């Protein structure tokens, strides 16, 4: 008889139903999540993705239509100096 493996859903949320077989062994059978549990799981996952996206992205510079390499370098250096003054707690 094939034993069911935990899915990422059951590992992350712990919705496990323990059942006993006829020979006394315990099997772990994932419960079917309801819509509230699925929505909660989805929202937690998406908020983690959104936090990562915010920390990994740069703000666009819409004021620069045709930037030259020198103007970009100046702008980046100004932002870098400002960032260093504020420190990592900004």
UniProtKB/Swiss-Prot annotation:
Q: Where in the cell is it found?
A: Host mitochondrion inner membrane; Host nucleus; Host cytoplasm, Host cytosol
InterPro entries tied to this protein? Flu_proapoptotic_PB1-F2 (IPR021045)
Keyword annotations for this protein, in alphabetical order, are: Apoptosis, Host cytoplasm, Host membrane, Host mitochondrion, Host mitochondrion inner membrane, Host nucleus, Host-virus interaction, Inhibition of host innate immune response by virus, Inhibition of host MAVS by virus, Inhibition of host RLR pathway by virus, Membrane, Modulation of host cell apoptosis by virus, Viral immunoevasion
Q: What is its main location?
A: host cell
Single Gene Ontology BP annotation: symbiont-mediated suppression of host cytoplasmic pattern recognition receptor signaling pathway via inhibition of MAVS activity
Stretch list, region Disordered: 1-36, 50-70
Could you say which residues are annotated as the site Low pathogenicity?
A: 66
| Intrachain disulfide bonds | none
- For region Mitochondrial targeting sequence, the annotated ranges are 65-87
The GO cellular component terms are: host cell cytosol; host cell mitochondrial inner membrane; host cell nucleus; membrane
Family in the record: Belongs to the influenza viruses PB1-F2 family.
Quaternary context: Oligomer. Interacts with human SLC25A6/ANT3 and VDAC1. Interacts with host MAVS.
Q: What else is known?
A: Is not encoded in all strains, and seems to be dispensable for replication.
**What is the role of the protein in this entry?**
Plays an important role in promoting lung pathology in both primary viral infection and secondary bacterial infection. Promotes alteration of mitochondrial morphology, dissipation of mitochondrial membrane potential, and cell death. Alternatively, inhibits the production of interferon in the infected cell at the level of host mitochondrial antiviral signaling MAVS. Its level of expression differs greatly depending on which cell type is infected, in a manner that is independent of the levels of expression of other viral proteins. Monocytic cells are more affected than epithelial cells.
Protein name (database record): Protein PB1-F2
Species: Influenza A virus (strain A/Duck/England/1/1956 H11N6)
Query: What gene does this protein come from?
Result: PB1
